[in-house]
């Protein structure tokens, strides 16, 4: 059984992943995979360099991630081009990791932030969605990424609205509360999952 885990930016998905890992389930992390491929010499690093040029690099040759984020989130056209350029490479790498882990484990998770936006839903037996209110999401994103309200709003607006994701979720994990509430909900879901398998 493969479970997709998703949620909007700053929804608390990373905390949910840690709780799942503590329960001894393996999690393929799409963001980490992307990060690894964006290091100097990686597949995405080269694709981004070919697309945007050397202006996106720091003096040491690494990607200037804040600048890259500003460029990509500056317009719908830039987001679309980024998805086109990076999406195919990411999908190939995630599929390879999924297929490899499926040979070892009967149950595992894949943490994919843009699961619905990039049409990954057919990959999964279940989809767990971490949900927060727009106000909580904006506050967390501003604090975590040191963004203005306008910058945070642009990033949130670039993702599919929560209401459109809800019908596709097997489980919705409400994360408007505190960490203890979240742990209780996720541990309960993991217990239910163990009873299914």
Curated annotation (Swiss-Prot):
Disulfide bridge map: none
Record GO terms (molecular function): ATP binding; dephospho-CoA kinase activity
Keyword ATP-binding: yes
Gene3D superfamilies: P-loop containing nucleotide triphosphate hydrolases
Keywords: ATP-binding, Coenzyme A biosynthesis, Cytoplasm, Kinase, Nucleotide-binding, Transferase
Domain DPCK: 2-197
Record EC number: 2.7.1.24
Reaction equations catalysed: 3'-dephospho-CoA + ATP = ADP + CoA + H(+)
GO CC annotation, single: cytoplasm
Residues the record lists as binding ATP: 10-15
Single GO BP term: coenzyme A biosynthetic process
Enzyme type, top EC level: transferase
Localization terms from the record: Cytoplasm
Pathway: Cofactor biosynthesis; coenzyme A biosynthesis; CoA from (R)-pantothenate: step 5/5
Family: Belongs to the CoaE family.
Role noted for this protein: Catalyzes the phosphorylation of the 3'-hydroxyl group of dephosphocoenzyme A to form coenzyme A.
HAMAP family on file: Dephospho_CoA_kinase (MF_00376)
NCBIfam families from the UniProt entry: dephospho-CoA kinase
Protein name: Dephospho-CoA kinase
Organism: Streptococcus thermophilus (strain CNRZ 1066)
Lineage: Bacteria, Bacillati, Bacillota, Bacilli, Lactobacillales
């Amino acid at each position: 059984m493969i479970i997709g885990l998703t949620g909007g930016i700053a929804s608390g998905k990373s905390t949910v992943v840690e709780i799942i890992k503590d329960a001894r389930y393996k999690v393929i992390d799409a963001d980490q995979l992307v990060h690894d491929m964006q290091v100097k010499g990686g597949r995405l690093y080269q694709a981004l360099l070919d697309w945007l040029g050397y202006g996106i690099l720091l003096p040491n040759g690494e990607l200037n991630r804040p600048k890259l984020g500003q460029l990509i989130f500056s317009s719908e056209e830039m987001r679309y081009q980024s998805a086109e350029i990076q999406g195919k490479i990411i999908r190939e790498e995630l599929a390879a990791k999924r297929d490899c882990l499926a040979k070892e484990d009967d149950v595992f998770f894949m943490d994919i932030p843009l699961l619905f936006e990039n049409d990954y839903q057919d990959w999964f037996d279940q989809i767990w969605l971490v949900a927060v209110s727009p106000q909580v999401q904006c506050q967390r994103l501003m604090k975590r990424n040191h963004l203005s309200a306008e910058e945070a709003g642009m990033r949130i607006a670039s993702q599919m609205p929560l209401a459109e994701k809800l019908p596709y979720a097997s489980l919705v994990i409400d994360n408007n509360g505190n960490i203890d509430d979240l742990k209780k909900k996720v541990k309960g879901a993991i217990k239910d999952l163990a009873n299914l398998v």
